[in-house]
Amino acid sequence: MNATTEPFTPSADLAKPSVADAVVGHEASPLFIRKPSPDDGWGIYELVKSCPPLDVNSAYAYLLLATQFRDSCAVATNEEGEIVGFVSGYVKSNAPDTYFLWQVAVGEKARGTGLARRLVEAVMTRPEMAEVHHLETTITPDNQASWGLFRRLADRWQAPLNSREYFSTDQLGGEHDPENLVRIGPFQTDQI
């Protein structure tokens, strides 16, 4: 894990190495979940590129997520510091009890370990999320991995899951599958 001082950082928190929120995985190959730092932007970008069918955003967008939205995002790294998992999202300004999960990516080496769920739960159990009682995301109808993840989260959190069409193919330029808005909640973050 490479953490350096970022001279532009308004907060001393960003200048410190990130402490792992959780250590997951097997004893022989642990994974560390923590808030992202500016040094993680390119690694996040590369991870998402390696995880089709995820939409790849610009490296700049991932740098912004790693700095401006770091309290609502998480990365998972292996012992070598390689980013093998990422979750991004934000608390909605018009609904401060709702976290909108934008993207979850898990690299091939870490798939099948429950890392996606652990990344989401690492974010949801942070003190910054104490007032959050709903999680929203969008999922294409055929993304079975994402549907499975969010159904498992709803079951674990003992919360209802509802969905409805949100963005049509036409709204997405005709080249993208429609996106359903999925909502889990209400739930209590202190019971996750």
UniProtKB/Swiss-Prot annotation:
InterPro entries: Acyl_CoA_acyltransferase, Ectoine_EctA, GNAT_dom. Residues 31-192 form the N-acetyltransferase domain. The keyword Transferase applies. Pathway: Amine and polyamine biosynthesis; ectoine biosynthesis; L-ectoine from L-aspartate 4-semialdehyde: step 2/3. Transmembrane segments: none annotated. Optimum pH is 8.2. CDD domains: NAT_SF. The keyword Acyltransferase applies. Does not acetylate amino acids like GABA, L-ornithine, L-lysine and L-aspartate. This is L-2,4-diaminobutyric acid acetyltransferase. It comes from Halomonas elongata (strain ATCC 33173 / DSM 2581 / NBRC 15536 / NCIMB 2198 / 1H9).
